[in-house]
């Protein structure tokens, strides 16, 4: 029996070599490795093992450094949180400066810190009347700051920690009407023309600004409502505030007359600044004649202060652009004593007169104020309107109230025509014989 191995043919050996090369290529083993001897491969393997150990130690070191950095960041975040819970020192930003990185380094210093800074620096003035230069602004983005901003700074490092809301006079904040009036245009009788003029001048530019832009016209800056007392000026302003979603600021003319010099002018400035911040907004100035009287020579300090307040109002009326969402409504019953500078075009452009109601308007007013009452069907409002000659809107409402009180006094369940007639007599008895509204 022959146990000797049979010699392989050259073709079989070549096929095996080709198979080995194919498997090496599939495994990613290069031709260089295949040509290496066993000792060289062992040596190469040891080198790779040592490199792997070095890389593992490097990864471990970087992991420890990362954990240390995370701990440091957490510690610094806790410190920042503690600093932000401490009381702030209120300051004002006076100026923002750009640092030029191309400035030459200062002599005599190994490292010039000023030349390495980039970005913005700030100059602030604290509430203790001290001015500081901040090379590093702090935790607030420098792009969001502007001169005049109110900021809170750390009392030790003076770094800016947070921006504070703009400060306004507390009296101006109280002028903002929080609760919307409930009046509607349908609650106003006999003033259809005045309602249309007010809507065109105030409401349309705020709600449909594109209509004015398409025509290329500028809407009026403000409206002056004038007429005798009791004709519905303040009522129409309240209805306008109820129908628009704008912020409504109500100023009374006597509020702007203050004892200290410049106090009234500051109130006017703060009111317009608050209106601009909360735009769209409407500023209603009632009793404008308290500060808008004609200027005259006077040695009294009080008269000069009133004139200063009016000049500030003129400045604010000229100051804001007509396309902004801030509108002014002024009301007075003494238009004859107002300063001509207030009445010129470009300030209070639209002037709306509120005359005494005619017979039809008086009937409509009494119907409006009687619609919630239990009224008898035989009440003739046209006859009541003829009997209330020279009555204004407020007196027509007083007639309805007096009629209700008379019916209540006699224990009735509904109001009759005679109750209204007695109410007219009651109001006429209280009315002065000679009531002059204009000089």
UniProtKB/Swiss-Prot annotation:
It comes from the Eukaryota. It is found in: Cytoplasm; Nucleus. ATP binds at residues 227-234. One of its GO terms (molecular function) is ATP hydrolysis activity. Its main location: cytoplasm. Disulfide bonds: none annotated. PANTHER family: 26S PROTEASOME REGULATORY SUBUNIT (PTHR23073). Component of the 19S proteasome regulatory particle complex. The 26S proteasome consists of a 20S core particle (CP) and two 19S regulatory subunits (RP). The regulatory particle is made of a lid composed of 9 subunits, a base containing 6 ATPases including PSMC3 and few additional components. Interacts with PAAF1. Belongs to the AAA ATPase family. This is 26S proteasome regulatory subunit 6A. It comes from Rattus norvegicus.
